[in-house]
Structures are given as structure tokens and as C-alpha cells.
Amino acid sequence: MLASSPMLLFLLSLLMAYNFDTTAGQIGVCFGQMGNNIPNPSEVVAMFKQYSIPRMRMYGPNPDALNALRGSNIEFILDVPNGDLKRLADSQAEANTWVRDNVQKYNDVRFKYISVGNEVKPGEPGAAALIQAMQNIDRALSAAGLSNIKVSTTTFMGPSRNTYPPSRGRFKDEYRNFLQPVIGFLVNKRSPLLVNIYTYFGYMNRDVSLQFALLQPNSNNEFTDPNNQLRYLNFFDANLDSVYAALEKSGGGSLDVVVSESGWPTQGGPGASVPNAEAYVNNLRLHVNKNGSPKRQEAIETYIFAMFDEAPRQTSPNDEYEKYWGMFSPTTRQLKYGVKFN
């Protein structure tokens, strides 16, 4: 038969390689707006274009930013703020209005995901409303003819336990019960789970060496997972694969993970410096574009936190580093260190 021709199979394999989505690992950047000297949104979008940053995450609707994104071709994650969850869960009409005003109205913006909530924790106000809010937003998007926009939520490493070795990863009991319906929703909709992963905190807490946290080679923390013989050369991969293991144990083994935040501060804490931030961001950029993790050897969609330093983020004198995650100075609009985004 013709289909069994070696030459035809070879040509088909070339065609598949040509059409493979090579953009999956391209780096995006989170645009937070908590600072009191952040440039206006039109300037920020112009900077994304100037530096060829292909993706943006923003933590809530901002009409000026959404208007500036029109026609920009920047792929976009828009968050539903945690404070809106209960209102949107209680009323399908409210969810419809939210989608109409913040998504449907901007039909020339490349919405990719709607993240319903960011790092929602069990017992917090609105936590019980999370899954219903996700369902209502999803229904509103479908009714508006926008079912190509995926609905998800953003979690973090806090729900995970037994992350060493990664194959033992699982969710803490209180989070497993909380996340189970979310995971079921994501599996049904074939949407990814968004996860914030920061290797900096492992270094700050003295759990791992600086090299291992910065994705630098020949760290004394490198190890082989005894349960599957996968080799781990950096802390980022170990974190990510522990999430995949936890998802497998919770019925979410088919899910992809989007790393919705990762970064390194430039001052204010142990190991927080411009050279270390430069090393981390560049090592991460190369890694997620080429290698994937030992468990999932494919490009990893990743967003760097953050575009700018955000002075009001400090929560206590011990958290000075929280103000200094930005890659750009908000006053000079210049990069603090060298990095390419594509």
C-alpha cells in the first residue's frame, strides 16, 4: 500500500516536524501594577513590542492595558482577581458581564487563558467559590463564541508535599480535596494547570545550593530519583516534576503545566542580586525552550515575574526582596540585565 512507503513516511515525518509548535517554550512576562511608578499601559505594551516579548500575564482587567494590547499579537493571560470569585460564582449573569466587558469587547486581543484566581488557598474568602466561578466563566466564554480561550486557575508549590524525590510528589490533604474538582474540570476541558514556581525560596530557606537553584551545571545537589531513575540537574525541574507526580495521583496525569510565574529578585534577600537574577532568567529561558523536564521532555510555557519592581509589595521588614523582582527599572524603562525573550 502507498501508506507504507518508506519515502512517504519520511516526508510525513518532515511535515510533522515542520508544523510542530515551537513557540510553546517562549518566555512571557508578568505585568504587575502594584508599584506607584509603573509606566502607563500603552508604554508597557510598546516595551513588550520593542523587546519582542511574545506573551503577557496581567492580574486583573485594566481597560487602558487591554486597549493598548489591541492588534499587538501578544498572547495574553488575564486573571480574575480573587476578590471577584464569589460574585462570579453566585451569578451566571455576572460572569457573562465580566466576559463581555473584559474579553469579548477586545476581539483583537490574543487571549490565551483566563486564570480564575491566583494562589487561592482553602479556607480563604472566595475559596469555596473557585470551581463554580471557573465553570461560569467557561460557560460565558462558550456562549460568546470564545471557547478557544482556556479557563484555568493558578496555584503554587505550597499545596505540594513529599516533593523529594519528585516521583513522590502529592498534594497535601486539604489541598487535594480543594483541587480535586478543579483538576476534573481541567481534564474535561483539556486546559492546563497554571503553577507559580520559584527556586529562589528553596535557596533562601537553605534547602538547596545556589547553583542548583540557578539552573547552573555541576551542582552538588544533583540527584537521581530512585523510583524512576530520572536525573535532576536543577531545582526547577524537580519542582515541576513533583507537580506532575501530584497531578497523576489526583487524576490529572494528562494535564500540562504552564509555569505562570518564576523569577529571581535583584536585591533585598540572601542571594538576591543582579548577576544572580540575570543567570537565573537566562538559564531558565534556554532550558524551557529546549529541554523540558526529565519527566516531560517538551517545551515549557513559562512567564517571568516580573516586568517591573513593585515597591508596595513589601509585607514585612524580612520580605524586602518582594519589591525587587522586576527585570526593568520602572523609572528608566531600561533592562537591569541582559536577556533575550525569543
Swiss-Prot record:
* Leader sequence segment: 1-26
Q: Can you list the GO cellular component terms from the UniProt entry?
A: vacuole
Q: What Gene Ontology molecular function terms does this protein carry? A: glucan endo-1,3-beta-D-glucosidase activity
What induces or represses its expression, per the UniProt entry? Following incompatible or compatible interaction with pathogenic bacteria, but not by wounding or salicylic acid. The induction is localized and does not seem to result from a systemic response. Induction occurs more rapidly with an incompatible interaction.
Tell me the superkingdom of the source.
Eukaryota
Q: What class of enzyme is it?
A: hydrolase
Could you tell me the EC number(s) of this protein?
Answer: 3.2.1.39
Biological process, per Gene Ontology: carbohydrate metabolic process; defense response
What protein family is recorded? Belongs to the glycosyl hydrolase 17 family.
Entry protein name:
Glucan endo-1,3-beta-glucosidase
Source species of the chain? Brassica campestris
